[in-house]
């Protein structure tokens, strides 16, 4: 978030792409959630509750479905759609069948952010336009984002 704070302070206009936590912060920023609010949300005890829900609940229920994260993002962002954002945004996730990075440029913002934040072994993958998506992948094991060309 520090980079976004400096760019905003200097009046530099940006397009945003991200993977995993970068998609969570970048998507909220592109939806014009203030950086101060994003920071407050990450430090808020309710968000900590959501983050704790990410942990798998072996053996009773298996891996986290990510539904708590999805509910949280929906409450924060409403029905925002990527293609309608005033700040260009793309989330990046990995197709688990092919290992190829998939750039999410349109559709529900909360769903794209949730897909990009689907840490393997922690979250269930997300279905998106015929792909089964997780964060990272063989080409980007840390969830790092390939450079994405945005307008």
Question: What is each residue range found by the language model?
Answer:
Residues 1-19, 27-151:
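Patatin-like phospholipase
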């Amino acid at each position: 978030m520090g980079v976004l704070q400096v760019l905003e302070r200097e009046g530099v206009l940006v397009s945003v792409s991200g993977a995993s936590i970068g998609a969570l912060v970048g998507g909220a920023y592109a939806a014009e959630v203030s950086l101060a609010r994003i920071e407050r949300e990450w430090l808020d005890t309710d968000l900590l509750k959501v983050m704790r829900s990410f942990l798998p609940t072996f053996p009773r229920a298996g891996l986290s479905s990510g539904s708590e994260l999805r509910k949280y993002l929906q409450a924060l962002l409403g029905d925002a759609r990527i293609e309608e954002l005033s700040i260009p945004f793309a989330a990046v996730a990995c197709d688990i069948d092919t290992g190829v990075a998939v750039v999410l440029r349109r559709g529900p913002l909360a769903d794209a952010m949730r897909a990009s934040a689907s840490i393997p072994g922690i979250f269930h993958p997300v279905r998106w336009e015929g792909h089964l998506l997780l964060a990272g992948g063989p080409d980007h094991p840390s969830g790092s984002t390939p450079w994405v060309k945005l307008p």
